[in-house]
Amino acid sequence: MSNWRHKLWRKLSSFQRASYSTTSSRNNKLKLDDLRKLRPMILKRIENRAKDYPVKEIVPVAEEILIARKNLISNIAALLKVFPVLTCKFCSEVFVGKEGHLIETCRSYIRRGNNRLHEWVPGSINDILVPVESYHLHNISQGVIRHQERFDYDRVPAILELCCQAGAIHPEEILQYSEIHDNPQISEEDIRSLPAGDLKYVGANALMAWEKVRAGVKKLLLVYPSKVCKRCKEVHVGPSGHKARLCGVFKYESWRGTHYWEKAGVNDLVPEKMVWHRRPQDPVVLVDEGRSYYGHAPAIVSLCSHTGAIVPVKYACKMKPQGLSFSFTNPVPNLET
């Protein structure tokens, strides 16, 4: 009896697979025919949509973003003259302080093992404000960038490209604007001579500018479409992503080819670089045994909190300002061993 049921089940399953494959192929053919007919209408609609941009009501928002971004870069560059920032030599870990922590979270680029101690080197402003670049489009209705055309277009900061499409920057002046405002010239002697009250004021201004930039980018993304690759986090500011085959270049990445585009968010254009945050009740050097006690914070927030600036309440759940600290009796291990 069981053999008869087995044969009947095989016949039914084979019939179901055959009917399903025939139906799917027929549906795919109908979809391709429909797309060929709709292609001229879609292209015409894209061209007509470009006439509605830039939206005049959104231009002041883009201008406020540029002003806040300029203040943010200058204030962070000034704070880095006083407060040291360290970055790991083998991974992207960042720490705000004179001495790096001893938390074993290094997943190095080279094959030296996971969950090891970090090897700290001096950091820069790019470790605090993570640079995110995208291709600069001549206009919003231009064709998709092909792989062989990837060197014909300039790479600019994604925020500037978003503000350029919003009408705050002229397309031909965006490269010059980036060179002037992204490299502020600040004297180290003038910053070190500032009293503690002025440093607190600089930190508060940096936090305020950071929040303004993120809030403004969130508003612009509601009007101007942007894409991000799900796999490699490549950002493209425009209605459709480019076709430069820059995704999956490593051997362990099996997809190797075009990007997998999805809608971009604020964290894709203005990423929060999360770091371990040392609180006043914590030891001088954070150890691996107390990692469950310590808090996290965006690198900018951690840097500005060292100046005494008031941190927004929304970061309190991650920073654990009133949380318990880990107490240990063993000496700190030597890094040289």
Swiss-Prot record:
Keywords: Mitochondrion, Repeat, Transit peptide. One of its GO terms (molecular function) is RNA binding. The keyword Hydrolase does not apply. PROSITE patterns: APO. The keyword Mitochondrion applies. Its main location: mitochondrion. May be involved in the stable assembly of several 4Fe-4S cluster-containing complexes of mitochondria. This is APO protein 4, mitochondrial.
